[in-house]
Amino acid sequence: MRKRISAIIMTLFMVFMSCNNGGPELKSDEVAKSDGTVLDLAKVSKKIKEVSAFAASVKEVHTLIKSIGDLAKAIGKKIKTDETGTLESSTADQNEQLVAGAFQVVSTVKGELESLVQVDGISDDLKAKVNEAKNANDGLLSKFKSSAKDNESVKKDEEAKKVIDRTNASATELKKLDTAVDELLKAANEAVSAAIAELTAPAKS
């Protein structure tokens, strides 16, 4: 995100350097590009700020979802006592707390996605992708709740993998959420790039 902000600042600087070299009289928030295009900098800057904040929030959601994969690596494991900081096999089928931790992550994501769909100024396409991710997240939450009905079952290594290990063939809900969040992040980044491009793109003929 720091690199993106730096790129925005550099682009704004380039626009200012190339603008207002003659042409019609402009309002205080307007600049004229070398091709004659008039930009409302206040409006464009506001759009860039909004879409960048949206993309940053999506990145946080993406990071949370991907962290479930790290939790899955601890199924049936414990920290070694030799201070190496690595994991080793432990008593099998004792995963209820691990699954509960993953459930909390997904519950947090639910709240984040509900907030994102309410953001003003984002495109209908982005809202649709947020809703797709939200629906996929709800599906995974339902799987957690279904698994929790049988506490003895959710403890088992193989049952835990079906919920939170994306390499498991039965973890279809998690894989669906992974795909939806990947697509949402890609679309959010493209929206930021498009907003920045408004500063440099030539006027349409």
Swiss-Prot record:
An example Pfam family from this entry, by short name, is Lipoprotein_6
Protein keywords:
Cell outer membrane, Lipoprotein, Membrane, Palmitate, Plasmid, Signal
> InterPro entries, alphabetically?
Lipoprotein_OspC (IPR001800), OspC-like_sf (IPR036437)
Lipidated sites in chain (S-diacylglycerol cysteine): C19
Localization per Swiss-Prot or TrEMBL: Cell outer membrane
The signal peptide annotation in the UniProt record is 1-18
**Recorded topology in the membrane:** Lipid-anchor
Q: Which residue pairs form cystines in this protein? A: none
The record places the lipid (N-palmitoyl cysteine) at C19
* Gene3D superfamilies in alphabetical order: Lipoprotein, type 6
Q: Which GO terms describe its cellular component?
A: cell outer membrane
Highest taxon, organism lineage: Bacteria
Function of the protein: The Vlp and Vsp proteins are antigenically distinct proteins, only one vlp or vsp gene is transcriptionally active at any one time. Switching between these genes is a mechanism of host immune response evasion.
Further notes on this entry? Genes for both Vlp and Vsp families are on (usually) unnamed linear plasmids in B.hermsii HS1.
Family from the record: Belongs to the variable small protein (Vsp) family.
Q: What is this protein called?
A: Variable small protein 11
Q: Which organism is it from?
A: Borrelia hermsii
Please name the taxonomic classification of the source.
Answer: Bacteria, Pseudomonadati, Spirochaetota, Spirochaetia, Spirochaetales
Q: Which gene encodes it?
A: vsp11
